Amino acid sequence: MDQFDLEKHYAEVNAALGIKNKRSDSDESYVIDLCDEVLGELALRQHTFDFLRGDPSESCPSGKKLPVDAYYPNKNIVVEYREKQHTESVAFFDRRSTVSGVGRGEQRRIYDQRRRDILPQYGIKLIEISYSSFNYYSKKKIIRNRQRDILVVKGLL
C-alpha cells in the first residue's frame, strides 16, 4: 500500500469510527484531496517557503512565513483554494486587525497577490481554484459530487 492509499485508508477508518477533524472535512481539504488524486501525489499541506513571507512585526521582524494550501514538490505546483472570503467580505474573517495596520480582508488580498507575484519567480506554478468552479450551496459550500468534481479539477490542473 503506497502513501496515498494509506492516507485514504486512515481517512476511511476515521470516518467509519465517527472521528471528525474540522479541517479535514473542509471544502479546501476536499478539493486538495481531489488534486492529490489527479496529480498522483500527496500535497504538502500548509507548506511554507523561506522566500514567501508576510509583513514584518515586532515579534517577527522578517515577517512570518506565509503558508500555501498545497505544494506538490515533484511537479513544482502550488494549489490555493479560494473560499468566499478571498473574493467578498466576510465579517467573521475580516473583523481582526493585522500587524500591517489594514483590515484582514485587505491583508488577505495583499498576501494572495504576493503569492501570485513571488511563487513564479522561483519557478513554482500557482493554480488557484475557486469554490465557484463547483456547484455550491447558497453559503458558498461545495455540493460534493466526486465524479463531477474530479472532472472540474482535471480541467483546472
What do these predicted regions represent?
Residues 1-157:
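Nucleic-acid endo/exonuclease domains
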